[in-house]
Amino acid sequence: MEEILIVTTNEVAGYRITEVYGEVFGLTTRSRNLFSSAGQQMKTVVGGEINGYTKLQHETRETSIDRMREEAKAKGANAIVAMRFDSSTFQNIDSVAAYGTAVKIEKI
């Protein structure tokens, strides 16, 4: 199985874009554990990293990237350029979208 190269730039050094398949997305929405949230709220008073939320955000981003990658593969792409994240939080729900442009590249 061919791997999908994902970059945040509009071009890939040493490659040229031969085909553009269009925008691809990966969306993940997760709710926070209410019991964990109560404990984490105490940390906001004294400061410091909130490890539970950091882990949740990391896992949510990785899942979004995986879904975007699968959509690009389904279109026949071997790369995604101009990859970005968008995220939002509402009450105890975190949502992350990974998006970019699916392309076919070849070495110059």
Curated annotation (Swiss-Prot):
SUPFAM superfamilies: YbjQ-like. Gene3D superfamilies: Hypothetical protein apc22750. Chain B. InterPro entries: UPF0145_dom_sf, UPF0145_YbjQ-like. It holds the Pfam family YbjQ_1. It comes from the Bacteria. Belongs to the UPF0145 family. HAMAP family: UPF0145 (MF_00338). This is UPF0145 protein YjfJ. It comes from Lactococcus lactis subsp. lactis (strain IL1403) (Streptococcus lactis). The lineage of its organism: Bacteria, Bacillati, Bacillota, Bacilli, Lactobacillales.
